Amino acid sequence: MTLKNKSIVVLLSGGLDSSTVTGIAKKSEAKIFGLSFDYGQRHKKELNSASIIAKHFDIEEFKIIKLDLSLWGGASLTDTQKNIPIDGVQTNKIPNTYVPGRNTIFISVALSYAEAIDADFIGLGVNALDYSGYPDCRPDYIKKFQELADLANKRGRENNPIKLWTPLLDLNKEEIIKLAFDNNVPLNKTWSCYSGNSKPCGKCDSCRIRNAAYEKWLNNNNKK
């Protein structure tokens, strides 16, 4: 798949994964249109990081969409009455940081935007290996959403579908960190922590997964 001179809408959260997708697209000489969401999350640090990443890669356009999912809560990321888990990643259990329907809503908005500007791809930073078990970050979800997208818009019906591009889907976090360095991603400007403190907490699932992967990458890199 070639991205050169193609238009791509990237869901840019400001975290490691979406920033890496943006870096890959930039290195591939794609025309990048970034979308972030102010969805009633606990803090705005990730939006600040997304803006910094958008400027760093000098993308074509960057939009922040206001869409308040905190109106009904249901997750510790949108409801401050719920505690963010800090006990470590638990297998076979979806944590309360999962925001109901978030990716489905975000990708649907991206699909509308992509069709409006005649973009060829939607870039997503989802990955199914080192993650918290969210149902909307899995390969079967992406496959089914692609099928839905092909039916839901004009381009799909005309056999010129907008494709979901998920270059990180089958990678672990260590591999993603390597890709980030290879594609000029300023890791110190990205934000992955679920908390909105001045520094990452180091205890939430997102911090634990990222920090463990970085240590592995660092150790392997030092052995070379």
Language-model features and meaning:
Residues G196-K224:
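Iron-sulfur (Fe-S) cluster-binding segments and ferredoxin-like electron-carrier domains
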Residues P167, W191, I209-A213:
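Low-complexity, intrinsically disordered or weakly predicted helical/coil tracts enriched
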Residues D182-G202:
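Immediate flanking context of iron-sulfur cluster ligation sites
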Residues M1-N183:
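ATP-dependent adenylation/nucleotidyltransferase module used to activate substrates
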